[in-house]
Design a protein with these regions (language model features):
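N-terminal acidic, proline/glycine-rich, low-complexity intrinsically disordered segments
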Residues: 1-5
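Acidic, low-complexity, intrinsically disordered interaction modules
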Residues: 39-148, 153
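Short acidic DE-rich linear segments
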Residues: 160-165
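Short aromatic-glycine-enriched beta-strand elements
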Residues: 29-31
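Structural detector for short beta-strands of small beta-barrel domains
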Residues: 14-17
Length: 165
């Protein structure tokens, strides 16, 4: 298990992706990335309280996970654009989501940076809005992704086909 760092200190965790799942929180959709080994994190108990424990997953807002992966995995942006355009042209019938991420990320080596935050600390949203954390937790950034050789070969082949004249 990765060790926890002091508050606001960044910890680095190296893991292998086992699965990407999708679930609903009632109002929103989230992607849960499950890893091969546990590390410290906060999980909600039966009473709705968040407790520090060992976890083997991280939940992401879909757009955040997709954006981080697009910025790191070479060729994934082309697959995303092709699927997104197909979705737009078919009135949203197809698109890019958890299934595509599962296909690309399964067995990928991933390096995460995690920063601890405490309840009551302020943070700024992507819209520039200042908010306050309601409970202790970690903010997580994906620093590096090494997809399997098979996946990278497929992405490279797709790029080669796009560049053929």
């Amino acid at each position: 298990m990765a060790t926890s760092k002091a508050e606001n200190e960044v910890s680095v965790i190296n893991v292998v992706v086992k699965a990407v799942r999708v679930y609903s929180t009632g109002d929103n959709v989230r992607y849960r990335v499950q890893f091969d080994s546990p590390f410290q994190g906060y999980a909600k108990d039966m009473n709705g309280d968040y407790n520090l424990t060992e976890i083997d997953y991280i939940d992401f807002v879909p757009s955040v996970l997709i954006a981080q992966c697009l910025n790191i995995v070479e060729g994934l942006d082309i697959l995303y654009t092709k699927k997104k355009e197909a979705g737009l042209r078919s009135n949203g019938v197809t698109g890019f989501g958890a299934a595509e991420l599962q296909a690309v990320l399964r067995n990928a080596k991933m390096q995460l940076e995690r920063k601890h935050f405490s309840a009551g600390e302020e943070y700024v949203t992507s819209d520039g809005e200042v908010r306050t954390h309601e409970h202790d937790g970690y903010s997580t950034s994906i620093v590096d992704i090494r997809v399997t050789e098979r996946v990278q070969t497929k992405l490279d082949d797709m790029l080669d086909k796009m560049l053929e004249i």
